[in-house]
């Protein structure tokens, strides 16, 4: 069942000029999330932009309750999000989506992704390793 929380931004990294990695304290979400889940983020306390932004979960530190997500600035909403500073609160709803994957059916896994879409595959690869599955990674990038 998704929860709505105010999470504290504890680390902000600019991976490129328009790509950011945020680390937030979100134990309530981390405790119930699985690979494949995502969160929805309210980017502003103002009326506009009205809609939350769906962002995939990159990494979950279950021991410390830290959730990490990576996003690319593509419009007004993600631009506002990129301006948040360490110490700010971020309004999150999550986990959302289908985080169910039955590893017992497979001996080998191929994880395929491209561009900004490779980041949510990290949690899937971590879980596959924990399940002792042989995992092949194919990633496409723009030059």
Model-predicted regions and their roles:
Residues 2-86, 142:
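Ferredoxin-reductase
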Residues 76-143:
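FNR/FR-type flavoprotein reductase catalytic core
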């Amino acid at each position: 069942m998704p929860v709505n929380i105010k999470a504290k931004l504890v680390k902000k990294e600019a991976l490129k000029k328009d790509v950011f990695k945020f680390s937030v304290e979100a134990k309530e979400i981390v405790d119930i999330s699985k690979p494949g889940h995502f969160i929805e983020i309210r980017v502003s306390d103002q009326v506009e932009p009205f809609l939350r932004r769906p962002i995939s979960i990159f990494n979950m530190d279950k021991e410390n309750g830290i959730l990490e997500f990576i996003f690319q600035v593509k419009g007004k909403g993600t631009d506002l999000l990129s301006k948040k500073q360490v110490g700010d609160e971020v309004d999150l709803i999550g986990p959302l989506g289908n985080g169910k994957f039955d590893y017992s059916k497979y001996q080998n896994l191929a994880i395929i992704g491209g561009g900004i879409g490779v980041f949510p595959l990290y949690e899937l690869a971590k879980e596959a390793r924990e399940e002792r599955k042989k995992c092949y990674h194919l990633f496409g990038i723009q030059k």
